[in-house]
Amino acid sequence: MRIGLYGGSFNPVHLGHVGIAKRAIADLALDKLVVIPAAVSPFKTAPDAEARRFWTWDRVEMVKAAFRDLEKTVVDLREVERGGVSYAIDTVRQIAAENPGAELFFVIGEDSVEGLPRWKDIEELKKLCTFKSYPRTPESSTAIRKLFEDNSVVLNQDEKIVRVVRDGLVRRGGYCPCRLPKNPEFFCPCDEFKGQLADKEFHGLCHCRLYRKP
């Protein structure tokens, strides 16, 4: 069996992630692609406890919605459920043990290749799986977050809004909770809920109001 492993923060999940998944399934002739959201990335600043509690499971629901219709794909929550910093080696060891004889492929974005030497137990990891990188298109999660940060936009912690965003993703099968203003490929999964999301302070940076001006 050929199994692809696609880990990451997916914060936020977007069309680029789904595009990479589709390419990996085809290019590598995968029998299964396992999408693994991280609890906390070892290479990114961890959110404070309150933000982490608030955001983690909504992020998970969005990841599930984004990948739910992609054939041969499953979402694995072991890292989120384990909590703490997520190291790829811990997860790959487990999956290798659970699937003896399987050929494992670790799918990463092109921008992660340079940092591979810093991954925990990278030499063992390379023996357990084959790495395959893909360009980040049309955007990276980091670029999306930077756009909002540069415009002083923060995560909206209004639970009603987050719930509506999540419901929109599920009902519309959307891939991204936030469409970049200059990128029409990103559609808002919550267009149908605009009446519920009225916000006089909103400046048009985030179409679904998951982020807001402080």
Q: Whereabouts are the PLM-identified features?
A:
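Long, distal/terminal scaffolding or interaction modules
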Residues: 155-214
